[in-house]
């Protein structure tokens, strides 16, 4: 596997409230995390960092994530646990009231690939040159799409497309959605909405399919393209690619 991750404040925000990492354990399992924080007085920065630190530590404490059943429970339990920590932190630090964060995670073992998400950070898989969105956003417009009141195209330009229905820190009990992707995937991409609000899936796919670019150059180019279009938000990308024979 080849991996690379990068985060950028963008062109408008004075500081970066995203956090991102990719970890590999001794069993050859990978954990990719992107978290997009929110809240004043740098509270969002704290929230997203808490998520990445907590999940990273829990992952590093494991010898292996075990079976698919074990891994699913591990994702649910640890995302629920860090949600409680964020809620508690906000209650003990009044200046951080309203703090929260999205999270999207990919957990890859030799036998399965799982995604978990809360909020509107996105998890994608690449298969045969096609970029497929795996996760569903916890937003008002996504609910309207699922109800048949909006088309996917209308949702892209809806004035309330960034209104979250669920995030870590928002309420006492939060359970992530879990998705599985079969092992025929070619690559995994996670991103904050700073990428997906600026670039269409087709534009992202085009960059990822460029044979002239290294994995690092692809991630850098995605972020540069977002900034060239205004860079209105922090932008974070975590990218994992299968090498030939894997």
Language-model-derived ranges and their functions:
Residues 1-246:
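PP2C/PPM-type serine/threonine phosphatase catalytic domain
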């Amino acid at each position: 596997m080849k991996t690379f991750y990068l985060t950028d404040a963008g062109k408008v925000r004075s500081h970066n409230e995203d956090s991102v990492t990719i970890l590999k354990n001794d069993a050859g399992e990978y954990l990719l995390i992107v978290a997009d924080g929110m809240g004043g007085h740098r509270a969002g920065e704290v929230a997203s960092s808490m998520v990445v630190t907590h999940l990273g530590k829990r992952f590093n404490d494991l010898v292996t994530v075990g079976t698919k059943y074990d891994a699913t429970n591990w994702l649910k339990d640890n995302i629920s646990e860090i949600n409680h920590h964020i809620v508690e932190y906000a209650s003990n630090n009044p200046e951080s009231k309203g703090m929260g964060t999205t999270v999207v995670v990919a957990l890859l073992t030799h036998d399965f690939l799982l995604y978990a998400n809360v909020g509107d950070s996105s998890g994608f898989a690449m298969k045969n040159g096609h970029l497929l969105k795996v996760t569903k956003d916890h937003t008002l417009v996504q609910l309207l799409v699922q109800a048949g009141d909006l088309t996917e195209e209308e949702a892209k330009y809806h004035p309330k497309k960034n209104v979250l229905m669920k995030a870590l820190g928002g309420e006492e009990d939060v359970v992530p959605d879990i998705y599985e992707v079969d092992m025929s995937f070619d690559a995994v991409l996670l991103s904050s909405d700073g990428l997906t609000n600026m670039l269409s899936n087709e534009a992202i796919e085009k960059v990822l399919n460029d044979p002239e670019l290294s994995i690092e150059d692809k991630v850098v180019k995605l972020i540069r393209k977002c900034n060239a279009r205004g860079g209105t938000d922090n932008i974070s990308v975590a990218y994992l690619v299968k090498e030939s024979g894997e």
